[in-house]
Design a protein with these regions (language model features):
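Divalent-metal (often Zn2+) His-rich catalytic cores of metallo-beta-lactamase-fold enzymes
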Residues: 214-271, 275
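Active-site-proximal loop/helix segments of hydrolase catalytic cores
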Residues: 169-225
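Active-site neighborhood of phospho(di)ester-bond hydrolases with catalytic His/Asp-centered motifs
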Residues: 69-71, 95-102, 118-120, 194-196, ...
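C-terminal regulatory/interaction regions
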Residues: 265-315
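N-terminal export signals
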Residues: 1-23
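Active-site HxH/HxHxD metal-binding segment of metal-dependent hydrolases
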Residues: 78-79, 83-161
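Conserved beta-strand hairpin/beta-sheet module of binuclear metal-dependent hydrolase folds
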Residues: 31-84, 184-196
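Metallo-beta-lactamase
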Residues: 22-31, 125-174, 179, 188-189, ...
């Protein structure tokens, strides 16, 4: 299905932009493992005040060059990221991985040669289908932050199970659930799992393209990996390696149960977005916001499932 601008705006439910303001990205990498830095995105929704820089990004130093996992929301961010990363390592960026189609993770690839940008085939297909709608929406929401940003597609399809960079080896895992094509990476040198948006930590999971059963299957796969820490797509670094996995699963399980109960109780969409959120999620950023977004994503399907038309047989 082709994504229209109206559908894009409704699905993302992003807040309106503010007026003109300073549009300089301030990027502060923090070392989390040997030769790996994390850039912690804003845990808020996409907004003019943060320039759309809400996704976490990894910088990885290897003997042969610098690797990036995700690239931010705009050309301006991508250029700033490139300068910061190369300043840290003293080596050029030789690979940029895009974990999935969403624009907070992938529009920054406009700053790089497509030949060094890698993504799963499904993610590239999704970006080709929806990318212009994403770009149009972000231009309208973020204004000057997006100036010069054009849709760029990754030039390298990930089909191999790993990639080696001068002895630093990354395991590449093709998964799904947050989107139809979710890339997760395991740095074998340190045991760090980079989960993309399959993992949220102390930040409510976003669901605009989610398939919850497939997401659970992917989380099960990640939990079995020989990793010791996790860098989620959103939220703080997880030094345990398992907390982000468990927390993400807990939220999507509760979400599905809560919305199903709301439909079966006859609540409308506004009422469903106001149901109580369990106390265990009290410290989770953007919880009410993501609940309300998820209502718009899932409610029509749940209503069709649980409230069938009287003139149609069930089952």
């Amino acid at each position: 299905m082709k994504m229209t601008r109206r559908a894009m705006l409704a699905g993302l439910a992003l807040p309106a932009t503010a007026g003109m303001a300073n549009t300089t990205y301030l990027i502060h990498p923090v070392a989390v493992e040997d030769g790996i830095w994390m850039i912690h995105g804003d845990d808020a929704p996409i907004h003019f005040s943060n320039g759309g820089a809400i996704a976490n990004i990894a910088i990885i130093d290897t003997p042969v060059g610098t690797l990036l996992v995700d690239s931010g929301p705009s050309l301006r961010y991508g250029r700033t990221l490139k300068a910061v990363a190369e300043g840290l390592t003293g080596k050029p960026v030789i690979r940029v991985y895009v974990t999935h189609l969403h624009p907070d993770h992938g529009m920054g690839i406009a700053a790089f040669d497509p030949a060094i940008i890698a993504a799963l085939p499904q993610a590239i297909t999704d970006m080709a289908r929806d990318g212009r709608g994403f770009s149009d929406a972000l231009y309208r929401l973020l204004g000057d932050w997006m100036r010069g940003t054009e849709l760029v597609l990754p030039g390298r399809k990930i089909t191999e199970a790993s990639e080696d960079f001068g002895g630093r080896r990354l395991r590449l895992m093709a998964l799904a659930g947050h989107s139809a094509g979710d890339l997760a990476l395991l740095d074998e040198q340190t045991g760090l799992l980079i989960g993309g948006d399959l993992l949220f930590h102390d930040r409510a999971p976003a669901t605009p393209t989610a398939d919850l059963p497939r997401w659970r299957t992917s989380l099960d796969s990640l939990a079995k990996l020989p990793h010791r820490a996790a860098l989620p797509g959103h939220g703080p670094f997880d030094p345990t390696g398992q907390e982000a996995i468990a927390q993400t699963r807990d939220w999507i399980d509760w979400l599905e149960d809560a919305l199903t109960a709301a439909v079966r109780s006859g609540l409308d969409m506004v009422e469903a977005g106001s149901v109580p959120i369990p106390a265990r999620f009290a410290g989770m950023a953007a919880a009410r916001y993501e609940l309300q977004r998820s209502v718009s994503h899932f409610y029509p399907g749940l209503e069709a499932k649980w409230l069938p038309r009287v003139d149609m047989p069930e089952g």
